[in-house]
Amino acid sequence: MNAARTGYRVFSANSTAACTELAKRITERLGAELGKSVVYQETNGETRVEIKESVRGQDIFIIQTIPRDVNTAVMELLIMAYALKTACARNIIGVIPYFPYSKQSKMRKRGSIVCKLLASMLAKAGLTHIITMDLHQKEIQGFFSFPVDNLRASPFLLQYIQEEIPNYRNAVIVAKSPDAAKRAQSYAERLRLGLAVIHGEAQCTELDMDDGRHSPPMVKNATVHPGLELPLMMAKEKPPITVVGDVGGRIAIIVDDIIDDVESFVAAAEILKERGAYKIYVMATHGILSAEAPRLIEESPIDEVVVTNTVPHELQKLQCPKIKTVDISLILSEAIRRIHNGESMAYLFRNITVDD
């Protein structure tokens, strides 16, 4: 390390054994020791964090993976960041491979943009930088008042396709829905493979026909000039499911950023099987797998589900041999090294497209 800069430490937020394991892999690659801290739940349910060594004037990196108990993991991260801030750490960088609440980054009716709220909370707790991977929406980076490095897992997943899928040249990249078409196209172009899109899978939201008016005058009942009436939207109809592209006699590789609704991937696999695909792979960066996921995957036409270790899924993997894991500790450790030494991050994005 550059002797002109301060030291650095890597801490695990200790939400799960998987978080500690990822932190150990990162520190081994960096040739560093894991910072000493204790994170535990008190008898009253509160989270307590104790930092067991001096961090004054150092760059601190907090590794936090997000298990199924999202809110506990978020509180662990916030409390640890605040503890390090009060201990006079120079910079506090959160290494959050899967950023929670990223699916709540848009306003929907009377909902809220929870992702923006979380960004504000992290800044208030003391974080000065975040390293994450494959944000669900790239616009989320604009929610933060400090730098966010959004790394990509696509080079690792592309390498897996080339090295672990026999006869991958006979494959076609599949988008489970039109929303995932750009990501699928990016994979298809770099592998020089065909592209298919499953259309009609997306569920339609219920149309709210109540206009919410309660105050006079009742304009709706008044005589108005033809053409000035507010147009009523037609009720949405769910289109029949179709596959745009040929998958007959091919290997189908479904790509997405998150697997959290396994049923939709199983349904897509069944459609592809009906269309003639003889092998089906599902690949995603984040595998947020429920307790039922192993059984659903095992009973489905899916041959393999390939995810990275951004989210803990060890128990599900033991229950289903179809689930495979790609380690991304290499890129996280290199990002930590470069940020601490003030080096450019451009090299980590050299094989990335805007649609990844």
Swiss-Prot record:
Q: Which residues cross the membrane?
A: none
Q: Which InterPro entries match?
A: Pribosyltran_N (IPR029099), PRibTrfase_dom (IPR000836), PRTase-like (IPR029057), Rib-P_diPkinase (IPR005946)
Acetylation as UniProt keyword: yes
Alphabetical keyword list: Acetylation, Nucleotide biosynthesis, Phosphoprotein
Q: For the modification N-acetylmethionine, which residues carry it?
A: 1
The biological process GO terms on file are:
nucleotide biosynthetic process
Q: What CDD domains does this protein's entry cite? A: PRTases_typeI
Q: Name one GO molecular function term.
A: magnesium ion binding
Q: Which Pfam families match?
A: Pribosyl_synth, Pribosyltran_N
Q: Phosphoserine occurs at which residues?
A: 177, 215
> What family name appears in the similarity comment?
Belongs to the ribose-phosphate pyrophosphokinase family.
Question: PANTHER family per the record?
Answer: PHOSPHORIBOSYL PYROPHOSPHATE SYNTHASE-ASSOCIATED PROTEIN 1, RIBOSE-PHOSPHATE DIPHOSPHOKINASE FAMILY MEMBER
Description of how the protein assembles with itself and partners: Binds to PRPS1 and PRPS2.
Function, as annotated, reads: Seems to play a negative regulatory role in 5-phosphoribose 1-diphosphate synthesis.
Give the protein name, as stated in the record: Phosphoribosyl pyrophosphate synthase-associated protein 1
